Regions:
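Ribosome-associated RNA-binding proteins
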Residues: 1-154
């Protein structure tokens, strides 16, 4: 991993820890302090990704809408004329649970937090949830604020 010039990262064998420090001469530099926090968070995310892994669950919601795996590609049938085929990036695992009903859960997992989030975001961007019928691709924990729609006979 490349580290900013104002930040030093080193593995301390005796403590079995990674120490991230601001380089000498830059202790009062606001940019160096910001880079220190970013570097520390990136290293923490790498360690957590290797030990526990990251997972996001997406829901494909809609009548007749579903997701399936076709080899190493995710195939989304979401109310368009053609199915959307998304290649799964290297290092990610996508599992589609075939559930009865209108919700199809899709689990995205991997060791790289950024890659998991980016693939989930790209999947959601194909068909964002809409507030009137609730159809779309959404995060499992996401709550869609519903709207009433037209009123007749005012």
């Amino acid at each position: 991993m490349t580290v900013h010039a104002k930040v030093k990262a080193a593995f301390v064998e005796a403590e079995k820890a990674v120490k991230v420090t601001v380089a000498p001469g830059f202790e009062n530099d606001a940019d160096a302090n910001a880079q220190w926090g970013t570097t520390r968070a990136l290293i923490r995310n790498m360690i957590e990704g290797v030990t526990k892994g990251y997972e996001k669950t997406m829901h494909v919601v809609g009548t007749g809408w579903n997701a399936s795996m076709a080899g190493k590609n995710l195939k989304l049938t979401v109310g368009l004329a053609n199915s959307i085929v998304m290649p799964v990036p290297e290092g990610l695992t996508v599992v589609v649970d075939k559930a009865a009903g209108e919700i199809t859960p899709v689990k995205i997992s991997g060791v790289n937090r950024q890659a998991v989030g980016q693939f989930a975001s790209a999947m959601r961007a194909k068909r964002k949830p809409e507030p009137y019928n609730g159809k779309g691709i959404k995060y499992a924990e996401e709550v869609i604020k519903r709207k009433q729609g037209k009123q007749f006979g005012a």
